[in-house]
């Protein structure tokens, strides 16, 4: 069995004396792991940095085997990631969530493209937090937990939508919320794609998407805690001037 594809490096760990096992998110084969022979060598180790865009060739005797990769660099994002605290925290959050959320060997070409585009924006701090929010919404949608923010779950109207139901993921208007308002999640305008937004508003929106990651996605994956990297990114965005 063999194939060739492009992929984003999500994680790398040492394997034996000279090899490494890498976890990747590929365009056509989904999240896929494999061994890189000589992965700790001076030639290959610098290539294997989280977020790197790689040309991957995978081979295994049987399809369900771990298999091995040969890798060639296409694009390093190390310089962009090291350009500032937001870029580094953002990269770590993206690759950690992809590793955490995605099942192995299940293709998600649309999310792959969205992830590639988001990582290519690293270092552009003025637009990155909002781009990340939109990516997180796409991640929830891909996993089957997408939010329906088009109309009120109670009235069906699309006016004055200011809350999200923590159970259904649907929007709720101010008038329909009534005495339940305190139990609902905030729906800031940026969560509905309504133009640019200040960072505090984006942080508020990320607390809402975080509820569904924590209380819907994580339980579906066996109640594992969300990656700490996401929490660190949210804390950083919350403190941006």
Swiss-Prot record:
Keywords: DNA damage, DNA recombination, DNA repair
Domain of life the protein comes from: Bacteria
GO cellular component, one term: bacterial nucleoid
UniProt-listed Gene3D superfamilies: Nucleic acid-binding proteins, Recombination protein O, C-terminal domain
InterPro entries the UniProt entry points to: ARFGAP/RecO (IPR037278), DNA_rep/recomb_RecO_N (IPR022572), NA-bd_OB-fold (IPR012340), RecO (IPR003717), RecO_C (IPR042242)
One annotated GO biological process: double-strand break repair
Pfam family, one: RecO_N
Function: Involved in DNA repair and RecF pathway recombination.
Family: Belongs to the RecO family.
Annotated NCBIfam families: reco (TIGR00613)
PANTHER family for the chain: DNA REPAIR PROTEIN RECO (PTHR33991:SF1)
Protein's UniProt name: DNA repair protein RecO
Organism: Ruegeria pomeroyi (strain ATCC 700808 / DSM 15171 / DSS-3) (Silicibacter pomeroyi)
Phylogenetic classification of the source organism: Bacteria, Pseudomonadati, Pseudomonadota, Alphaproteobacteria, Rhodobacterales
């Amino acid at each position: 069995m063999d194939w060739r594809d492009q992929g984003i490096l999500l994680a790398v760990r040492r394997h034996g004396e000279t090899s490494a096992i890498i976890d990747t998110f590929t365009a056509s084969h989904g999240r896929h792991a494999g061994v890189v022979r000589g992965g700790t060598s001076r030639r290959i180790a610098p290539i294997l940095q989280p977020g790197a865009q790689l040309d991957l060739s995978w081979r295994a005797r049987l399809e369900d085997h771990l298999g091995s990769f040969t890798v060639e660099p296409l694009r390093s994002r190390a310089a962009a990631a090291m350009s500032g605290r937001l870029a580094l925290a953002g990269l770590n959050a993206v690759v950690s969530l992809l590793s955490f959320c995605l099942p192995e060997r299940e293709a998600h070409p649309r999310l792959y493209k969205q992830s590639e585009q988001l990582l290519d924006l690293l270092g552009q701090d003025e637009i990155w937090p909002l781009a990340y929010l939109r990516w997180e919404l796409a991640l929830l949608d891909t996993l089957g937990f997408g939010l329906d923010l088009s109309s009120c779950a109670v009235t069906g109207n699309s006016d004055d939508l200011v809350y999200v139901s923590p159970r259904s993921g649907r929007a709720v208007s101010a008038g329909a919320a009534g005495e339940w308002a305190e139990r609902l999640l905030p729906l800031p305008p940026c969560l509905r794609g309504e133009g640019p937004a200040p960072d505090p508003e984006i942080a508020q929106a990320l607390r809402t998407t975080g509820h569904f990651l924590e209380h819907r996605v994580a339980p579906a994956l066996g109640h594992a805690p969300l990656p700490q990297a996401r929490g660190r990114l949210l804390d950083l965005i919350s403190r941006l001037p």
